[in-house]
Amino acid sequence: MSSVRLRKEIKRRGKDPIGHIPEIILNNFTTRLGHSVGCMFAFLFPHNLQFIRREVATFHNQRDCIFFRLHRYIFKSEKKGGIQELGPRFTIKLRSLQKGTFDSKYGDYEWVHKLWEMDISRRKLHI
Amino acid sequence: AAAGARWNHVWVGTETGILKGVNLQRKQAANFTAAGQPRREEAVSALCWGAGGETQILVGCADRTVRYFSTEEGRFQGQKHCPGGEGTFRGLAQVDGTLITCVESGIVRVWRDNDKEASSDPLLELSVGPGVCRMRQDPAHPHLIATGGKENALKVWDLQGSEEPVFRAKNVRNDWLDLRVPIWDQDIQFLPESQKLVTCTGYHQVRVYDPASPQRRPVLEATYGEYPLTAMTLTPGANSVIVGNTHGQLAEIDLRQGRLLGCLKGLAGSVRGLQCHPSKPLLASCGLDRVLRVHRIRNPRGLEHKVYLKSQLNCLLLSGRDNWEDEPQEP
């Protein structure tokens, strides 16, 4: 995880989002591994189709870095909408995906990020 | 696809119960299921060649059935339910018209191999101890099997002999802190032209045992990496083994000196199955990253083929035939 901005560091932020279930947007998770990881992020939040609160959490994948943002939106008019940033923002990169529960020593890994094998070429992306 | 099944080079069993046949020459992969939908309960846990050359494959599934697959016809022919003990199959073998199965709780059973009867009583039953990780048959002496597992030392059994093991390995001496070294044998191989066995452990050790020598402790011990070694295979020439661990690292280890010869790169997930061709320098590997890779082991070392198969791969069988490139033309 890198580039972390906690709530108190974000300027002009909205009110507390605690207790409200946001909607999820997953951007650009194209590969097979990316699709699995994207589904895992979506399942972190309870599934609620009621859309009561106007809050949305965005996971945007760009070049193997996933950017997380939390916004609240309002509709100012028919065509125009505005967003207000709440919540922390951070960037995360996938290090490994394990099969089963967390066991870093003896567990089976489904995908492991290997620096000297996978990051040699700038054009080859994994997520 | 069914007609060309006999020309497939690699057969892979998956976690969803599908048997996949891969033809590396034509770069095609085909799915073979016994019936209908793939299910997690039928996850393939063991594969071995059946009787009569490479015309039949025995597929051991997690629901304790062994299915017979014919490569000539390209379809499943029958199945046999093998109850007894708990856990999934850890080893399958065939000798003289009988089927040998070993499950995780340590029950080894020898069944009469007639696939017309769906289930029958076992001919012979052995208890090898709980927590078995692998049961392997000696290709030179088909009635000898070796078993090993977590806190279950390596034992060699003679199925035609008595109920006691022929060779029972002893644990190494206590380490430098005077603590008992734990045992976790993950894979076993018999070395040809001698009685020796090689095991790779979950504590990243590779050990060679010699039943002919008076000591029951390992003759040679080598370590590789920091992660559990999950699969092992012998190279043609049999002076070295290739091991794979849960991080997807493949390494070739020399058995004469116990040193690392080289590594193979490419895998991103835990290695589940490894097999070398008996004469060509080719190694097939499959793992949890859902890709089957064929590497060339020497001159030059590198990746030959890479095939994405959509489910997690559990075990594989590499065809040992020599005419890899020669294929008959379609009429």
Predicted regions and their residues:
Chain B
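Terminal intrinsically disordered, low-complexity extensions flanking WD-repeat/beta-propeller proteins
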Residues: 1-9, 16-18, 27-31, 36-46, ...
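Loop/turn segments within WD40 beta-propeller blades
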Residues: 2-7, 47-54, 92-97, 135-143, ...
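Conserved strand-to-loop turn within each blade of WD40 beta-propeller repeats
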Residues: 13-16, 60-63, 102-105, 148-151, ...
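WD40-repeat beta-propellers
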Residues: 22, 66-71, 108-113, 154-158, ...
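A structural motif specific to WD40 beta-propellers
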Residues: 30, 77-78, 119-123, 164-167, ...
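WD40/WD-repeat beta-propeller blade N-cap
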Residues: 35-44, 50-51, 81-90, 124-133, ...
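Asp-box/WD-like beta-propeller blade repeats and closely related beta-sheet repeat scaffolds
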Residues: 79-141, 172
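Solenoidal tandem-repeat scaffolds enriched in leucines and small polar residues
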Residues: 126, 131-212
